[in-house]
Amino acid sequence: MDEIINFFKSHDIKSIGLGCFGPIDLNTNSPTYGHITNTPKQAWKNYNILGTLKGHFNIPIGFDTDVNAAALGEATFGSAKGIKNVLYITVGTGIGAGALVNGELVHGLLHPEMGHIFIRKHPDDLFPGICPYHHDCLEGLASGKA
């Protein structure tokens, strides 16, 4: 975070758009709004990433999931420009998806954790999966780490 803060302080920026891996708390009424919550990435668990940035910058800071930020970027500047309904899926250390429906980012009680959808394994597949929460969800079976 120190390197990120120093980088942005060395530039004349007017706002920041923070697309963050999760799970994150997007509920503006929650006491942990802006936190990375119960992530398997132990060094980031319960980290107030938005509050840390706000403590260093007195500018507008947008906050959403990394995949929603990517979906919005594609709909604004990229291959989905001008399209109102967009689904952006990424496969890496996890599996994530961001979505726009009628031009609006999808949110709910939490953000959609599409990588944690349960899928049926082949009966002969004995791999237990790597997701620390569900083991054999989509992310646990098909992410880069799996």
What are these model-derived regions, one by one?
Residues M1-D12:
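N-terminal phosphate-binding loop and adjacent alpha-helix
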Residues H56, G62, F77-A146:
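Glycine/GP-enriched mid-protein hinge/lid loop-to-helix segment characteristic of carbohydrate kinases
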Residues F21-I24, G92-G94:
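Short glycine-rich anion-binding loops that position phosphate/pyrophosphate groups of nucleotides
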Residues I13-S15, H135:
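A broad structural signal for short, well-ordered beta-strand segments within beta-sheet-rich domains
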